[in-house]
Amino acid sequence: RQEKVSLIVKEVVKDLRPSLELKISTDEEEAFTDADFIMAQMRVGGLKMRVKDEQISLKHGCIGQETCGAGGMAYGMRTIGPMVHLIDVCEKYASKTYWIVNYSNPAAIVAKATQTLRPNARILNICDMPVEVEARMAEILDTDLSNLEVDYFGLNHYGWFTKVQCNGEDVTEKLKKHV
């Protein structure tokens, strides 16, 4: 799988940032030595386990989605160990000012676990869900996304928009009524 993905990444880097040095390796020391930024998007267990997580959860009347409920918890438990290992490898080999940019789900569970188990880790846990919701709000309000200013608290599917303004006007209640 790594070889297939690396072919695509090589083309993207060549087109967008030809001066960027791209290393592809399965050797931890070679891959992480002096790295400044490490991008992580883990799917521990692959899509087969995602299907199982969701089906087992639904069978028992629970939410099966990969970030919330029983399905998300199972996925999170599988992901914590490899993420902690990645942090340890980065601590050992990467530059002293490294940053891990983690895009792995379930973001909230993985973020809390890494914060607890490796409190000094240099890791940013991110998700595009809030951005997608914000884009939908702009559609509902028939405005450009650049006209919105939002207050958001949380991470991924465990977050809340506490205030939404459109061109300076508070439209939070208007959006609530739409929902």
Regions found by a protein language model. Give the residues of each.
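Short, surface-exposed basic-aromatic patches at helix termini and helix-loop junctions that form
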Residues: 10-14, 92, 112-123, 138-145
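Short acidic, glycine/serine/threonine-rich loops at helix termini
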Residues: 4-5, 50-52, 112-116, 136-138, ...
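Rossmann-fold NAD(P)-binding glycine/threonine-rich loop
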Residues: 44, 48-118
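Substrate/ligand-engaging "lid" and interaction regions
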Residues: 122, 126-179
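Conserved acidic residues
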Residues: 35-36, 98
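Flexible loop/turn segments at secondary-structure boundaries
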Residues: 2, 32, 47, 107-111, ...
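Conserved N-terminal Rossmann-fold NAD(P) cofactor-binding segment
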Residues: 1-34, 41, 48-50
